[in-house]
A protein has these predicted regions:
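Sec-dependent N-terminal signal peptides
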Residues: 2-10
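Bacterial Sec signal peptide processing site at the extreme N-terminus
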Residues: 9-33
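Conserved small-residue packing positions in alpha-helical repeats and bundles
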Residues: 18-22, 35, 59, 66-69, ...
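Residue-level recognition of tetratricopeptide repeat
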Residues: 27, 41-44, 158
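Post-signal peptide N-terminal segment of secreted/secretory-pathway proteins
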Residues: 44-137
Length: 169
């Protein structure tokens, strides 16, 4: 008797209905979950209906974050903005790679914006690194090294960042 109860519970758990995508709080992950569902079942009506709403919510939330970060003067704002733009670009990529998803959502491509933002960030990190490099002391040299490294990571081969890293080291 216990065996049948346990078996019934397992069967019910494995046959659960589609998640209500719109009731979940993490729009970014929920959007990717809906796309994953569409990869398996391209006619899943729950995912197809939720996807445009999820994309709009996630896109708007990330753009609000970007707007908020852009008013900051801290160097870390670049990392936060790049992360948010990377998220919406990943959404774009996931949607255009899925026929069912791309039929119900026309996502925005942020690739050029992300490229430009990385160049702006690299310039800011490079400038800050130069300021630290011109100061005496090991701690400032370390900070200069880290900022030159960051500039080169954002834009590989950025100006003479690698040479300056050697100089700071």
């Amino acid at each position: 008797y216990i065996f049948y109860s346990f078996l019934s519970l397992i069967i019910l758990a494995s046959c659960k209905t589609n998640k209500d995508y719109l009731s979940r709080s993490d729009n970014d992950n929920t959007l990717f979950d809906a796309i994953k569902t569409l990869k398996k079942h391209n006619t899943d009506t729950t995912a197809l209906q939720a996807l445009p709403v999820l994309y709009n919510l996630a896109q708007q939330r990330n753009l609000r974050k970007i707007n908020s970060y852009s008013s900051s003067r801290e160097l870390s704002r670049w990392d936060k903005m790049i992360n948010a733009y990377s998220t919406v670009q990943e959404m774009y990529n996931a949607i255009v790679e899925n026929d069912a998803a791309s039929r119900v959502v026309t996502p925005v491509n942020y690739q050029q914006t992300l490229y430009d933002l990385k160049h702006e960030a690299a310039a800011d990190y490079y400038t800050a690194a130069t300021v630290f490099l011109n100061k005496p002391g090991r701690a400032d040299a370390k900070q200069a090294y880290n900022y030159f490294k960051k500039a080169d990571k954002l834009v590989p081969g950025y100006e003479d960042a690698k040479l300056k890293m050697d100089e700071a080291y």
